[in-house]
Amino acid sequence: MNRLIIVCLVAAMIYSTIALPMKEDISNDERPISVNEEPVKKNAAVAGAVIQGATLTFQVLDRILTVLGDISRKIAIGVDNESGRKWTAKNAYFFSGTSDVVLPYSVPNGKAFLYDGKKTRGPVATGAVGVLAYSMSDGNTLGILFSVPYDYNWYENWWNIKVYSGSKRANKWMYENLYYNASPHKGDNGWHEKSLGYGLKSRGYMASSGQTKLEIRVTRA
């Protein structure tokens, strides 16, 4: 009788092994890709990104404006670093308006950073006006002004760029210095060049509309 029970148990074990094969554990990383499945490509040309300087175009800035949506006052900014120095973000200061984007932190030589600004949400009479500050690897600071006003009956688009000696943060003083005292450029749909000192020069373009773009290239003099 005992031998019969043992034989039955062995037979049951063999049957269960055949009928229930071991479950295969496939993690997400090892999951086979369907022939119709394509890898997702992330578009790096968005506000807050750092891209190759040579790929900075007006089309890139136009896409940033599109992403911002239907806002009456907005700006897409692209600044190309061909200075031979590394830039490190200090801060952004807004005299008017705001941005939801973090200022790109590290901008090596040969790269360009992308940023944006917009009027404050709601029925408020504000434009997009501010200053960006970047510390350069030579110990000096690059200040960049952008000004897109709300009321074009009284104001116009302006931009500026300047190298400050030593370490400086973007603030109201820097804004007023760049806007009133440091020969700003009008946003007039034209290119403007100037010497920045410290062995550098700039060339930039700003459109004249309320939904505008600003492209600046900083190179060795």
Swiss-Prot record:
In chain numbering, where does the site feature Interacts with the lipid membrane fall? 202
Residue(s) at site: Important in the initial contact with the lipid membrane:
155
* InterPro entries hit by this protein: Actinoporin_PFT, Anemon_actinoporin-like, Cytolysin/lectin
Respond yes or no to whether keyword Signal is given for this record: yes
**Keyword terms of this UniProt record:** Cleavage on pair of basic residues, Cytolysis, Membrane, Nematocyst, Secreted, Signal, Target cell membrane, Target membrane, Toxin
- Spell out the GO cellular component terms annotated for this protein, sorted alphabetically and separated by semicolons: extracellular region; nematocyst; other organism cell membrane; pore complex
Renumbered to this chain, region (Trp-rich region, which is important for the binding to lipid membrane) spans: 147-162
Q: Report residues binding phosphocholine.
A: 96, 129, 147, 149, 175, 179-180
Q: Where is this motif: Cell attachment site, crucial for protein stability?
A: 186-188
- Expressing tissues: Expressed in actinopharynx and in gastric filaments. Is not expressed in tentacles.
* A biological process term (GO) from this entry: monoatomic cation transport
Q: Which residues form the propeptide?
A: 20-42
Can the keyword Secreted be found in this entry's annotation?
yes
Q: Which residues form the signal peptide?
A: 1-19
Q: Which GO terms describe its molecular function?
A: channel activity; toxin activity
According to the lineage, what is the superkingdom? Answer: Eukaryota
Pfam families given for it?
Anemone_cytotox (PF06369)
Q: Where in the cell is it found?
A: Secreted; Nematocyst; Target cell membrane
Q: What does this protein do?
A: May be involved in digestion of prey. Pore-forming protein that forms cations-selective hydrophilic pores of around 1 nm and causes cytolysis. Pore formation is a multi-step process that involves specific recognition of membrane sphingomyelin (but neither cholesterol nor phosphatidylcholine) using aromatic rich region and adjacent phosphocholine (POC) binding site, firm binding to the membrane (mainly driven by hydrophobic interactions) accompanied by the transfer of the N-terminal region to the lipid-water interface and finally pore formation after oligomerization of monomers.
Q: How does it assemble?
A: Octamer or nonamer in membranes. Monomer in the soluble state.
Family the entry assigns? Belongs to the actinoporin family. Sea anemone subfamily.
Q: What is known of its domains?
A: Composed of a long N-terminal alpha-helix and a core region rich in beta-sheet structures. Before the pore formation, the alpha-helix binds the lipid membrane, partitions into the lipid-water interface and stabilizes the monomeric molecule on the membrane. Finally, it traverses the bilayer, thus forming the transmembrane pore.
The protein's name is Deep sea actinoporin Cjtox II
Native species: Cribrinopsis japonica (Deep-sea anemone)
